[in-house]
């Protein structure tokens, strides 16, 4: 288990050793694994909600039509794509890739999921961005809030992973809380938990 107080010290040292810059830097967390066989299908594909808000929330695209599409727009989703737009995108692979790479997370009306899978599944799947289904009566605002404060963590064929846990102007304790949330979530996916964790670098 990762000790949060130790993470605070690691973050302090990282900030002190870094040169002053005129722009806000993202704070990245790197985890290195050991004693796992990447050739036997070891992979991580996790979404982790950070407990402390960052100044740069994740971008969320919602695929929905009708009432849910209107609710998504009213909730100020970063992008709302209806069924007609999905069909247009599926005919333009270059435009589809650009759109998919632009957003961190995708949500979709449960009724649209089969269409999304058929039209864009081959592009969304390999990128780990298949939409999370949203039931018709679900509170869109709650879904948006959860995913905007989340990070996507992927590792395939590699003994390391990295993700953004915040920005340097955040407090050390807040950054440590986010780092701890990520570490705890990833440990649960490892065959032997923390024993498979070799290094944490921030």
Language-model region placement:
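OB-fold/S1-family RNA-binding modules
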Residues: 1
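Interdomain regulatory linker/hinge segments that flank or connect interaction modules
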Residues: 6-17
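Translation machinery proteins
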Residues: 16-70, 92
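Short, surface-exposed beta-strand/loop "edge" segments at domain boundaries and coil↔beta transitions
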Residues: 70-71, 171
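Glycine-rich phosphate-binding loops that contact phosphosugars or nucleotide phosphates
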Residues: 73-78
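Long, charge-patterned amphipathic alpha-helical coiled-coil/hairpin "stalk" segments used as oligomerization
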Residues: 81-190
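C-terminal functional extensions of proteins
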Residues: 191, 195-198
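Conserved small/polar residues in nucleotide/adenosyl-binding loops
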Residues: 200-202
